[in-house]
Amino acid sequence: FFACQSRVRDLGRREYSKHMLRLRREGHINGKEVPEIILLNSHDGSSSYQMIPGIFRFVCTNGLVCGNNFGEIRVPHKGDIVGQVIEGAYEVLGVFDKVTDNMEAMKEIHLNSDEQHLFGRAALMVRYEDENKTPVTPEQIITPRRREDKQNDLWTTWQRVQENMIKGGLSGRSASGKNTRTRAITGIDGDIRINKALWVIAEQFRKWKS
């Protein structure tokens, strides 16, 4: 359904760079939120095939990636690759119900303003590591970009944070005090890393609030 690839400085390696495919079942092309298989690969064999369950949210075009505890599959570039990829795809499909159940559970969990602030703070630590070097505040990260995202449940809070971090463009100040804007996360590895980390944070909140 969707494809992208990493940018490379050496144009001769453009056809061999890491790429990502987001795959959906035929009956899940449209919908408010649809489960996906995220396939990562590089044609030169420098990284193994990876298949990760995810969710695509149409209202903000957010592509979410589930954490490692939801059945990430890795297939090395050797042996019966096709057979292993097909088997791995079925394994990922098998966890879709669990992913959907957790999503629905998050929609039922209300977060007060302090809890939303804590979620935003944890997310910024994932991106910038040092709290003193974050160019924006947790309040900016949890601020909705559209009317549909003003709800205070865990699922929607997570969506706001994910979109603000991935798309960037937030006004802030650098460590030296200069005006700046947060950068969008455009690389495949960075996108996957942030998404996985946010899923883990959301899961921790779900368990804490349940």
Tell where the protein language model's regions lie, with residue ranges.
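Intrinsically disordered, low-complexity regions enriched in serine/threonine
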Residues: 5-14, 20-210
